[in-house]
């Protein structure tokens, strides 16, 4: 989409206090930007690789959570005959490992796109901790989610609260789960392999296998809680803030459903 899309995504940085956050809140845009958004109602934000990664990652996490739960709490055997003939847990473990590989490869692809994509592509990989404006907007969003503000602010990318959540639970969370997950895989694969060479140090650092399993399991529950809140917040904002959320991750366009943009 031409016009406001290109202007917003390719606009030069105007100052350290204005665009530390890639989200570029519309309430702080220029008068011309606001009028363009009013006329066109839509801004192209998320490129195709970002959207594909989002849904691939969501599917991989779903498989990892379900299979990971059963690995930690195996099903009681209800089969008749030898367990080796049924191989139920073997299939569950294989699905877990396969989904872990997919998530890992996709995450490295996402890191690559952060460098070559538009400025929204790298938003989740950092937090502008020294930007006072960011934290002011962060507090506002907290108040909005707790129903202490009457009107929402609208953002082109992630709002500051979502920005912090994505960095914490996706960027750091996935990194943590990959490191601990591959370390557990390396333990089972044995010494001398590639995974042991890359991740064998983790077990030594944690000091025992059970602690490593526990940390990985707790990380799973943290991501589950984040996913539930993430889905709730996306649907809530779609309805209450009058700007698209769910459809944006399908089409790539952020649609503003009314002209209340400040």
UniProtKB/Swiss-Prot annotation:
Protein topology in the membrane: Multi-pass membrane protein
GO terms for MF: electron transfer activity; heme binding; iron ion binding
Record keyword Glycoprotein present: no
Gene Ontology CC annotations of this record: plasma membrane
Gene3D superfamilies listed in its UniProt record: Transmembrane di-heme cytochromes, Chain C
Localisation: Cell membrane
Main location: membrane
GO BP annotations, alphabetical order: respiratory electron transport chain
InterPro entries listed in its UniProt record: Cyt_b561_bac/Ni-Hgenase (IPR011577), Di-haem_cyt_TM (IPR016174), Hydrogenase_cytochrome (IPR051542), Ni-dep_Hydgase_cyt-B (IPR000516)
Record bears the keyword Ligase: no
Keywords annotated in UniProt: Cell membrane, Electron transport, Heme, Iron, Membrane, Metal-binding, Transmembrane, Transmembrane helix, Transport
Stretches that traverse the bilayer: 52-72, 97-117, 164-185, 218-235
Task of the protein: Probable b-type cytochrome.
Similarity annotation: Belongs to the HupC/HyaC/HydC family.
Protein name per the record: Probable Ni/Fe-hydrogenase B-type cytochrome subunit
Species assigned in the record: Rhodobacter capsulatus (Rhodopseudomonas capsulata)
Lineage: Bacteria, Pseudomonadati, Pseudomonadota, Alphaproteobacteria, Rhodobacterales
């Amino acid at each position: 989409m031409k016009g406001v899309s290109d202007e917003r995504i390719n606009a030069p940085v105007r100052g350290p206090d204005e665009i530390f956050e890639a989200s570029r809140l519309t309430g702080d845009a220029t008068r011309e930007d606001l009028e363009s958004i009013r006329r066109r109602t839509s801004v192209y934000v998320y490129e195709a690789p970002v959207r594909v990664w989002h849904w691939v990652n969501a599917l991989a996490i779903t498989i990892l959570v379900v299979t990971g739960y059963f690995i930690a709490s195996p099903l009681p055997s209800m089969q008749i005959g030898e367990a080796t003939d049924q191989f139920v847990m073997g299939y569950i473990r294989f699905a877990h490992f396969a989904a872990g590989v997919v998530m890992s490869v996709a995450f490295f692809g996402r890191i690559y796109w952060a460098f070559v994509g538009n400025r929204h592509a790298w938003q989740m990989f950092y937090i502008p901790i020294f930007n006072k404006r960011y934290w002011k907007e962060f507090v506002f969003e907290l108040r909005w989610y707790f129903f202490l503000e009457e009107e929402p602010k609208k953002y082109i990318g992630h709002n500051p609260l979502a920005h912090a959540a994505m960095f914490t639970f996706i960027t750091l969370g996935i990194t943590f789960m990959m490191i601990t997950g591959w370390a557990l895989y390396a333990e089972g694969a044995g010494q001398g392999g590639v995974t042991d060479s890359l991740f064998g140090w983790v077990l030594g650092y944690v000091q025992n296998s059970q602690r490593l399993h526990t940390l990985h399991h707790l990380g799973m529950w943290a991501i589950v809680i984040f996913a539930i809140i993430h889905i709730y917040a996306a649907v809530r904002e779609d309805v209450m803030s009058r700007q698209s959320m769910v459809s944006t991750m399908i089409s790539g366009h952020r649609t503003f459903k009314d002209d209340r943009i400040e």
